[in-house]
From Swiss-Prot:
Record InterPro entries: Adenyl_kin_sub, Adenylat/UMP-CMP_kin, Adenylat_kinase_CS, Adenylate_kinase_lid-dom, P-loop_NTPase
EC number: 2.7.4.3
Record bears the keyword Ion transport: no
GO cellular component, one term: cytoplasm
Residue segments, region LID: 122-159
Function in brief: Catalyzes the reversible transfer of the terminal phosphate group between ATP and AMP. Plays an important role in cellular energy homeostasis and in adenine nucleotide metabolism.
Residue numbers binding AMP: 31, 36, 57-59, 85-88, 92, 156, 167
GO process annotations (BP): AMP salvage
Family matches, as HAMAP family: Adenylate_kinase_Adk
Protein's UniProt name: Adenylate kinase
Region entry NMP, spans: 30-59
Length: 214
């Protein structure tokens, strides 16, 4: 079961990725984790990536695709894998296709921008412990205070409205075209395109996914 997840930042991909991994016993492949692991292991691609990063440049699609090819050849990917955060662009999707990576399911989580902004702007964090809250969905016992220590909660820079809207802008210009790309792929190949309403309760979205993948 080879799956690609699509959806804007804050659409709930991470939560459902965890569910899919546990339910179907397949690993989540994150390009960031792969890069860090390759650099740490000092592989040939890792060395190339490190040189590029040290020079303050972006790692090329060629290096990322090479890392993915190495990663999916590993034993734990025999039953499949979950690609999260890749592809982000049409050229990356083309590269994956040219490499002969067949995709069984593309799963899109659909959530309106304003809902994502509300979700993320409502997040509060206790930085020393990493505990997170939400003013609406998971409020602390005392407003603005961590449940355990009573220390102040903060809004992380990543969760500020202007940052969220900027990230959504990048998503719409770069990644949203993949929705059309994979919709077309589904019409022409064995890839199935599944779209879920990401505003539903987490358990309901998980149940919908399980039903669709049955």
């Amino acid at each position: 079961m080879r799956i690609i997840l699509l959806g804007a930042p804050g659409a709930g991909k991470g939560t459902q990725a965890q569910f899919i991994m546990e339910k179907y016993g397949i690993p989540q492949i994150s390009t960031g984790d792969m890069l860090r692991a390759a650099i740490k292991a000092g592989t040939e691609l890792g060395k190339q990536a490190k040189a590029v990063i040290d020079a303050g440049q972006l790692v090329s699609d060629e290096i990322i695709l090479g890392l993915i090819k190495e990663r999916i050849a590993q034993e734990d990917c025999a039953k499949g894998f979950l690609l999260d955060g890749f592809p982000r662009t049409i050229p990356q999707a083309d590269g994956l296709k040219e490499m002969g990576v067949a995709v069984d399911y593309v799963i899109e989580f659909d959530v309106a921008d304003d809902v994502i902004v509300e979700r993320m702007a409502g997040r509060r964090a206790h930085l020393p412990s990493g505990r997170t809250y939400h003013v609406v969905y998971n409020p602390p016992k005392v407003e603005g205070k961590d449940d355990v220590t009573g220390e102040d909660l903060v809004v992380r820079d990543d969760d500020k409205e202007e940052t969220v809207r900027a990230r959504l802008g990048v998503y719409h210009s770069q990644t949203a075209p993949l929705i059309e790309y994979y919709g077309k792929e589904a019409a022409e190949s064995n890839t199935k395109y599944l779209k879920f309403d990401g505003t539903k309760q987490v358990a309901q979205v998980s149940a919908d996914i399980e039903k669709a993948l049955a």
